[in-house]
Regions:
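Short acidic/glycine-enriched loop/turn segments that link adjacent beta-strands
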Residues: 36-40, 98-103
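Core segments of cupin and vicinal oxygen chelate
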Residues: 2, 9-51
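Conserved active-site tyrosine of GNAT-family acetyltransferases
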Residues: 18-22, 84, 112
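Active-site beta-strand termini and strand-to-loop segments that position acidic
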Residues: 44-48, 107-110, 120
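Vicinal oxygen chelate
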Residues: 5-13, 59-85, 103-108
Length: 121
């Protein structure tokens, strides 16, 4: 199946801190930190479908404005929201019902990005 999105990049200012945060809340490892063209990046798992990376480099500025990336957190949302709160991060919207499309929560990551977490329950 063809996806409307093929890749995403989320800007970070401290890639080591961001890798630790996403590893903790998602319960999965990001690919090791790589470097290319003056940027440092770590990729999210890409087993099925679309993936992306967190990227540190010139011109990559974290923000709560603009495009909102929805990360697939598996079947159940609440345990991931709990890990975000335990990590001391802000939960902007703890649970938003999306009808047949599941549920989502909006958070602010360690870098200042607004990110959505998506699950079916």
């Amino acid at each position: 199946m063809r996806h409307a999105v093929s890749w995403f990049e989320m800007p970070v200012t401290d890639i080591d801190r961001a890798v630790a945060f996403y590893t903790t809340i998602l319960g999965t490892r990001l690919a090791g930190i790589a470097e290319a063209d003056g940027r440092r990046y770590a990729m999210f798992p890409a087993e099925d479908g679309v993936s992306g990376a967190i990227v540190q480099g010139e011109g990559y500025v974290p923000s709560t404005e603009g495009t909102l990336v929805f990360l697939n957190v598996g079947d159940v949302l609440q345990p991931v929201v709990d890990r975000v709160e335990a990590a001391g991060r802000q939960v902007l919207l703890p649970r938003m019902h999306m009808g047949e499309f599941g549920v989502a929560a909006f958070i602010v990551d360690t870098e200042g990005n607004k990110v959505a977490l998506h699950a079916m329950a």
